[in-house]
Amino acid sequence: MATAQPSQVRQKYDTNCDAAINSHITLELYTSYLYLSMAFYFNRDDVALENFFRYFLRLSDDKMEHAQKLMRLQNLRGGHICLHDIRKPECQGWESGLVAMESAFHLEKNVNQSLLDLYQLAVEKGDPQLCHFLESHYLHEQVKTIKELGGYVSNLRKICSPEAGLAEYLFDKLTLGGRVKET
């Protein structure tokens, strides 16, 4: 295997930032993979919550797009894309919409922390281009996603009980159904 040649376009792009972006790409891919698992759980015939399916499928697509955007940045800046193994989701059956939404909420907070750490590294390494990229494409969107999921979790907690099948069905149709059609 040939050793990679140094990039001729690389300028003031610290190797630590390069490595941190590769780590964040892995996190975005894992998140996409996990949301795909959630989506198709809700698409099963014995679960049949169509709008949960659509919602998590859209989140999966968004996370894949985020990973690809970071890969394009790596190439633009003269970095080297180094893909890592994507671990298997710990949970395969999501039990309920509430459990899935809570998992998504905590996952998005982890993604946000990774982005904040990456941003801080870019500041420390004096990389205004990376700071601007993260501000323009990720940070605000991430906060909006956390807020949205937090609201969904709060609403589901209010309406869910041990036998909350009807409440979950109504949440799927009325809340997520309207949300999916807007996008």
Curated annotation (Swiss-Prot):
<dbReference type="GO" id="GO:0008198">
    <property type="term" value="F:ferrous iron binding"/>
</dbReference>
<dbReference type="InterPro" id="IPR001519">
    <property type="entry name" value="Ferritin"/>
</dbReference>
<protein>
    <recommendedName>
        <fullName>Ferritin heavy polypeptide-like 17</fullName>
    </recommendedName>
</protein>
<dbReference type="InterPro" id="IPR009040">
    <property type="entry name" value="Ferritin-like_diiron"/>
</dbReference>
<feature type="binding site">
    <location>
        <position position="66"/>
    </location>
    <ligand>
        <name>Fe cation</name>
    </ligand>
</feature>
<dbReference type="InterPro" id="IPR012347">
    <property type="entry name" value="Ferritin-like"/>
</dbReference>
<comment type="similarity">
    <text>Belongs to the ferritin family.</text>
</comment>
<feature type="domain" description="Ferritin-like diiron">
    <location>
        <begin position="11"/>
        <end position="160"/>
    </location>
</feature>
<keyword id="KW-0408">Iron</keyword>
<feature type="binding site">
    <location>
        <position position="108"/>
    </location>
    <ligand>
        <name>Fe cation</name>
    </ligand>
</feature>
<dbReference type="GO" id="GO:0008199">
    <property type="term" value="F:ferric iron binding"/>
</dbReference>
<dbReference type="InterPro" id="IPR014034">
    <property type="entry name" value="Ferritin_CS"/>
</dbReference>
<dbReference type="GO" id="GO:0006826">
    <property type="term" value="P:iron ion transport"/>
</dbReference>
<dbReference type="GO" id="GO:0005737">
    <property type="term" value="C:cytoplasm"/>
</dbReference>
<dbReference type="GO" id="GO:0006879">
    <property type="term" value="P:intracellular iron ion homeostasis"/>
</dbReference>
<keyword id="KW-0409">Iron storage</keyword>
<dbReference type="Pfam" id="PF00210">
    <property type="entry name" value="Ferritin"/>
</dbReference>
<dbReference type="InterPro" id="IPR008331">
    <property type="entry name" value="Ferritin_DPS_dom"/>
</dbReference>
<keyword id="KW-0479">Metal-binding</keyword>
<feature type="binding site">
    <location>
        <position position="142"/>
    </location>
    <ligand>
        <name>Fe cation</name>
    </ligand>
</feature>
<dbReference type="InterPro" id="IPR009078">
    <property type="entry name" value="Ferritin-like_SF"/>
</dbReference>
<feature type="binding site">
    <location>
        <position position="28"/>
    </location>
    <ligand>
        <name>Fe cation</name>
    </ligand>
</feature>
